[in-house]
Amino acid sequence: MQEQYRPDMIEPKVQQYWAENKVFKAIKDESKEKYYCLSMFPYPSGRLHMGHVRNYTIGDVISRYQRMLGKNVLQPFGWDAFGLPAEGAAIKNKTAPAKWTYENIAYMKKQLQLLGFGFDWDREIATCKPEYYKWEQWFFTELYKKGLVYKKTSTVNWCPNDETVLANEQVHEGCCWRCDTPVEQKEIPQWFIKITDYAEQLLGGLDALPQWPDMVKTMQRNWIGRSEGVEITFDVANTNEKVAVYTTRPDTFYGVSYLGIAAAHPLASLAAQNNSELAAFIQEAKNAKVAEADLATMEKKGMATGLFAIHPLTGEKLPIWVANFVLMHYGTGAVMAVPAHDQRDFEFAQKYSLQIKQVIEPIADEEIDLTKQAFVEHGKLVNSAEFDGKDFDGAFNGIADKLEKLGVGKRQVNYRLRDWGVSRQRYWGAPIPMLTLENGDVVPAPMEDLPIILPEDVVMDGVKNPIKADPNWAKTTLNGAPALKETDTFDTFMESSWYYARYTCPQYQNGMLDAEEANYWLPVDQYIGGIEHATMHLLYFRFFHKLLRDAGFVTSDEPADKLLCQGMVLADAFYYTSPTNERIWVSPTLVTLERDEKGRIIKATDPEGRELVHSGMTKMSKSKNNGIDPQEMVEKYGADTVRLFMMFASPAEMTLEWQESGVEGAKRFLGRVWNLVYQYQQNPAKTSLDITALSAEQKVLRREVHKTIAKVSDDIGRRQTFNTAIAAVMELMNKLTKASLDSEQDRAVMAEALSAVVRMLYPITPHICFELWQALGNESAIDTAEWVKADEAAMVEDEKLIVVQVNGKVRGKVTVAADADEDTVKTIAFADENVKKFIDNQHIVKVIYVVGKLLNVVVKP
């Protein structure tokens, strides 16, 4: 081996070996335990960013470690290739989305290969390829035949900028999650998949995922939003109309003072027919923000409809109001309002001078003031006829029973979850495989017509969707009769909901999945991706797996056993203010810094000498120009150094702060490992290790080696605290660099230690370890080496160091045999010269011995 560590020479050579020998090709082998490790695939945006690098490094470390344990490891890769950014880039660059996408895939693939990830590239998937989405289209038609797909005109979240429908999950604080444009409500025909049919399974299944983060499971539970309540039907006075509400608090039923209905409720339209003021209010409410998150904070507005509902138990007439806090797509689109016991209803009632009627009082003697706020806790009933005095459960059941007997109510389990709207009005997506016949009937496209191929050679003008603009594209025939193809495309979450399963058989042409391959590899053993996907991708991912199970493709109930949500990558962000008062962000790579003695930034300047404002560590982003190009870092420091820093700088689930000084430190550490192996190689051990002939110092060093092996194995395998595993190896390296290499057994202990260090670092820094493994005299590549095992016997200590205290103050330390009893420890401790100074001529009151650690002598004159 050469004396200097040169990653620029080592890494290309090792990567070439891996590629030529298909080292990471996964083949089904029933004789071996499988391990499927998957990182969420990326959108091919053009260049890798450090968030990608972190995600895929974590996955690669886990995959390589599991392979060393002897498992048959699958780590595939692919591209979530449909989506809006391709259309925007195509318009901007005057190219086709397909061309832009495929160029990006090629470029990003080269970047990934530079980082040495052990992917099985033979299984590569791009979701925009017809051979992939053909089966998605086919599965959609099968779901339609099962009654799990339907089309309806509905009020949807519409982004006027992107001209597309957004799922509820894609509306953040009333704005589009992608472009931040205020979202409008619009009536549009949409295709839906009945995810609500699986709500109970999706909820219950969370209990079978002990290795998923609690936060993700909580977010999904809240998103599914199961509640038990009663659906109650009110007659509308002087009409034949009825209005249904759902409540989880039937105990408050006698306190209803008005009903609130959504602007899109049919009763609202009825009431507005001869009321222009109401019609204008309804239109305003329809166009308002629609995100559920806004409901708690937005101003409550309403208008009386002039209609009244009849309370089914009291006969009281209750005014019906259109209220902007009632949404048509949640529940029935109407609510019963109990101002005394619901804060939102209370605020609305106070604003519009509506009745506030108490029907619940605290169980304890607690003072409440219903002129100031609602009392929302459970309590006992008052002003509620025969139910007075009952607690929540008694009132719930009693009132529900009465309503059911009268035929105006029924117990019901409701979910906050809504069916999944999968239609998108964009071009760059998989065409929805449905046909409209001349008579207006809508039918699924037959299998022989699939895939319905999206034309890739198109011109984007930024105004019209090419397949909607081309009247000929939609024209087709079914059984010789004219028909029109659907021009909407699938939500891209469709593709990412089943890609993990297609990886098990990407070339399979006889069906959506090869059940034999799928059931060998699935479920995914380890899934890795950001927590921002908790209520979108990760919910659809679980839903699709249950659909695949019910279609007979897979036997497991859940798609992934274990989930790791990696933290974001942060970097310093710097800016100056332009003469027009605009913030101009400057890349951290161009900034010259001055720091104080604690390392804090006190001055930052750009190449022109301008003093910059340091806005702190923030998520790497284009908008703040603080992204660090992984490729530049690999070229400067080497892939192993970048990988090591990524795994060492922070626990995997926490945010990681990019510090180039830390990257430099990682490079220095690898240089030390290289140097130690080089020094050893100049005079290697010529005989094997003889553990019966070791000196005390050699035993101590060997004990440290095996304690480190045990810790690193647990940290990488069970705990997934990769940063502490690396810290343990660094600590061991400090001891190894000080160790003697004089005797043959010194060198034999060092040989064992270096073999262990190289194997422990291999999952994290595979290129350097590949080279060092050969330098240590191993004939086969480290890729086939077994994980190093800790020798339990080596970790047993012959001696213990006992701290000796006198009256709680340390007065000495003594070495005793590991199995020494208390009397022996006392004898040795009392003979210590320094201890004797403090106990001679003193009365020993008592002696406290903490076995193997501490002896405390309590004395008095």
UniProtKB/Swiss-Prot annotation:
Residues annotated for ATP binding in this entry: K622
Alphabetized PANTHER family for the sequence: LEUCINE--TRNA LIGASE, MITOCHONDRIAL, LEUCYL-TRNA SYNTHETASE
EC number(s) stated in the UniProt entry for this protein: 6.1.1.4
Catalytic activity: tRNA(Leu) + L-leucine + ATP = L-leucyl-tRNA(Leu) + AMP + diphosphate
CDD domains: Anticodon_Ia_Leu_BEm (cd07958), LeuRS_core (cd00812)
NCBIfam families on file: leuS_bact
The UniProt record lists the keyword Ligase: yes
Family, per entry: Belongs to the class-I aminoacyl-tRNA synthetase family.
A GO biological process held by the record: leucyl-tRNA aminoacylation
GO cellular component: cytosol
Key words, A-Z: Aminoacyl-tRNA synthetase, ATP-binding, Cytoplasm, Ligase, Nucleotide-binding, Protein biosynthesis
Top-level division of the source organism's lineage: Bacteria
Pfam entry (one): tRNA-synt_1
UniProt gene name: leuS
Name under which the protein is recorded: Leucine--tRNA ligase
InterPro entries with a match to the protein in the record: aa-tRNA-synth_I_CS (IPR001412), aa-tRNA-synth_Ia (IPR002300), Leu-tRNA-ligase (IPR002302), Leu_tRNA-synth_edit (IPR025709), M/V/L/I-tRNA-synth_anticd-bd (IPR013155), Methionyl/Leucyl_tRNA_Synth (IPR015413), Rossmann-like_a/b/a_fold (IPR014729), tRNAsynth_Ia_anticodon-bd (IPR009080)
Positions occupied by motif 'KMSKS' region: 619-623
Subcellular location: Cytoplasm
Motif segment ('HIGH' region): 42-52
